[in-house]
Amino acid sequence: MSQPPEHPGNPADPQGGNQGAGSYPPPGYGAPPPPPGYGPPPGTYLPPGYNAPPPPPGYGPPPGPPPPGYPTHLQSSGFSVGDAISWSWNRFTQNAVTLVVPVLAYAVALAAVIGATAGLVVALSDRATTAYTNTSGVSSESVDITMTPAAGIVMFLGYIALFALVLYMHAGILTGCLDIADGKPVTIATFFRPRNLGLVLVTGLLIVAVTFIGGLLCVIPGLIFGFVAQFAVAFAVDRSTSPIDSVKASIETVGSNIGGSVLSWLAQLTAVLVGELLCFVGMLIGIPVAALIHVYTYRKLSGGQVVEAVRPAPPVGWPPGPQLA
């Protein structure tokens, strides 16, 4: 009778296949790997030189902890205008005085610049008074003011001062709101120490120039550019980018989520308008809330992060247990 053929590399067992229990396989002979998802039986160990099978494809070791210094309290990068409003109001209530006082101070400074400029322009202009008497004998007067070269120079300088103050205020408020978004402690002085002020001034000049040119060609292009460049100053303050790169980054950010940008802009406008309806006193709340919405939108749409809103602390003490009858 013929014997079955022997497989190469698997010589016939000289002992008839009867091996003692617990003996190791011959040298060079690897034990068949266990089925996927199973390991060695409990209480056993692998012989020397025998490696455990690799994990199934598509699986790897469990992820380790984040590297030291990585912030674990940050939110995901998704954007929702509802979350923006909720987060901004929460952050405002946690920093109300710190936000309101700088806005009030900037408002007083703006009013002082406008009032001083207007007063000097009127004082340096030529005035001509003309008296009229109608057929009923009622007299009236009209005053014609003609601006002199000196008054024109004062008005020009006043516009420059007002523009610089607005940009300074914008950069200062953004600096404080960005620190709030990072979870850093802020004080009233934080809002008067804007970062990258030189980049902010040049970026603001670039935006105004392009918007003005677009307005001369047609009003709509200027408005569109002003809308897509709304985050340029935030990029300059937060990431120290050049004016041109700040504008480009803002255009890309708005273009990546036009719907979210529009809703955020409408939310900011609503906050300011509601403040105006409350006899302008409400703007002390509306402007900071709008700035926080702006910062939240900028961070989320540009791939940045913000700290989570502060949740109210749970009540002190153990919760009451079930009441027995």
UniProtKB/Swiss-Prot annotation:
This is Uncharacterized protein Rv2560. It is found in: Cell membrane. It comes from Mycobacterium tuberculosis (strain ATCC 25618 / H37Rv). Its main location: membrane. Keywords: Cell membrane, Membrane, Transmembrane, Transmembrane helix. The chain crosses the membrane at residues 96-116, 153-173, 205-225, 273-293. Residues 1-75 are annotated as: Disordered. The keyword Cytoplasm does not apply. It is a multi-pass membrane protein. It comes from the Bacteria. Residues 24-70 have a biased composition (Pro residues). GO terms for cellular component: plasma membrane. The keyword NADP does not apply.
